[in-house]
Regions:
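Generic structural motif
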Residues: 11, 23, 84-86
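Acidic, low-complexity intrinsically disordered segments
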Residues: 32-87
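Short, flexible N-terminal segments of the mature chain
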Residues: 14-42
Length: 87
């Protein structure tokens, strides 16, 4: 099973969090993109992956999307995603 945890932070307080489970046979990359799309589905556009996000995610299976990753203004400091379980 693949699980990705998404958290929205503002002023060092977690505003919202969501864990996405994926049991599909997709590649790890597809699972990450699908989970991120699901986290952003309700009220947020999908962030743009910058080089710093890609590098952090490769190294730590975790990254933070700040205002520069979004086209529209966001009402929080950053969106953090982290892989918490992988097969």
């Amino acid at each position: 099973m693949f699980r990705l945890w998404g958290k929205m932070w503002k002023d060092n307080h977690m505003l919202k969090d969501l864990v996405i489970d994926d049991d599909s046979e997709d590649t790890r990359t597809h699972k990450i993109f699908h989970a991120l799309q699901e986290i952003c589905y309700d009220d947020l556009e999908n962030p743009i992956w910058l080089e710093s996000n890609i590098s952090d995610f490769k190294r730590h299976s975790k990254t933070r999307f700040r205002q520069d990753s979004f086209i529209e203004h966001i009402e929080f400091d950053y969106l953090e995603i982290q892989v918490i379980e992988e097969d």
